[in-house]
Design a protein with these regions (language model features):
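Ligand-binding pockets and gating/stacking loops
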Residues: 4-330
Length: 330
């Protein structure tokens, strides 16, 4: 992934445009500055069941993270692809040589060591670590969490409907995780950075599996009565140039792009905005990434203007400006 892609992802996931060209600000990676959308939702809405509230699959989205919220709001990254026959979530199972009795002894030993080390006192850092341990233990011992991640147990016809592709099985896994209580699932799919041979890449590798997976997810959520309570957003970090380059590809373009919303209180079957005949620039009121994040957080019941203080005491709003895209709301 090139620097511009990473910078674009940071902007899309946090709403804050990086003001440093090389992805670094005085040696600090930019995913350590502002919290990403998933981390905001994780902090504001919290856990709901044993599964982590914020999950990324099949790999980290990149350029987004917990920022000044701290590591407890970082995503749980699966980093294996559910389309693989051997798909298994790392660290989800207790070691084979540790039976239930031994596991309980280890847990009591850890609790005793924590109490001794704290000297009967519990500061903020100690309490945070204790929360880590408790959530980790809940994850590895929860039958519900194991069931949610066990995509191999899904009905074969359902798996085929989503498509036996990375985006298909990631979308199906996302539905299972939302059912189990997860708040935010981030899915990354392939490389749409088609600087070379754009049309073949879209026609054969990118569009068909995405179309199948997305339509299956919407239908599945609707049939299960989940769509009105689940917001689905499909987007990239930028658009592509209207003009084809010398390699039959399209380059980076930040002036115009499309985003798809479904469910979660949005209005179905609605096209908002328009562009010129070459899709170069909007011909109606343009919307910013801040408008987009403002709308998403509002639909999730979160105040996008809420102020947090960084560790240095600097007041920072969740979203730096923006307003609701009212035409989108049902």
């Amino acid at each position: 992934m090139c620097i511009r892609d990473r910078t674009g992802r940071h902007w899309v996931l946090t709403g804050y445009a990086p003001n440093f060209p090389d992805g670094q600000a005085k040696g600090i990676p930019f995913n350590e500055i502002y919290p990403s959308l998933g981390s905001i939702i994780s902090k504001e809405l919290g856990h709901r069941g044993a599964v982590p509230p914020y999950i990324e699959v099949p790999e980290p989205l990149g350029a987004g993270g917990p920022g000044y919220f701290g590591a407890q709001y970082a995503p749980f990254t699966i980093e294996t692809d559910p389309v693989e026959p051997t798909f298994e979530v790392r660290d989800l199972n207790i070691a084979k040589d540790v039976n239930a009795s031994r596991f309980e002894r280890r847990k009591r030993l850890l609790q005793g060591a924590d109490t001794l080390g704290a000297g009967g006192k519990s500061d903020g850092k100690a309490a945070t670590m204790q929360t880590y341990y408790e959530k980790a233990l809940e994850l590895v011992t929860s039958p519900q969490a194991k069931k949610a991640f066990k995509i191999q147990n899904e009905n074969e016809a359902v798996r085929e409907r989503y498509g036996m592709t990375s985006i298909g099985q990631c979308s199906l896994l996302a539905r299972r995780l939302v059912e189990a209580g997860s708040r935010f699932i981030g899915i990354s799919h392939g490389s749409w950075d088609t600087h070379v041979d754009n049309f073949t890449g879209h026609e054969k590798a990118l569009v068909p599996p995405t179309d199948q997976a997305f339509s299956a997810l919407i239908e599945d959520l609707e049939q299960r009565g989940m769509l009105e309570d689940t917001l689905v957003v499909m987007m990239g970090e930028m658009g592509r140039t209207p003009r084809i380059n010398k390699d039959a590809g399209r380059d980076h373009w930040s002036m115009s792009q499309a985003v798809i919303f479904a469910g979660g209180g949005t209005k179905p079957g609605t096209v908002i905005g328009a562009s010129d005949k070459t899709a170069s620039y909007p011909t109606t009121t343009p919307y910013s990434i801040q408008d987009l994040l403002h709308t998403i957080l509002s639909l999730m019941g979160i105040n996008p203007a809420k102020i947090y203080e960084t560790p240095l005491g600097r007041p920072v709003p969740l979203v730096n400006g923006g307003s609701m895209i009212s035409e989108l709301i049902a």
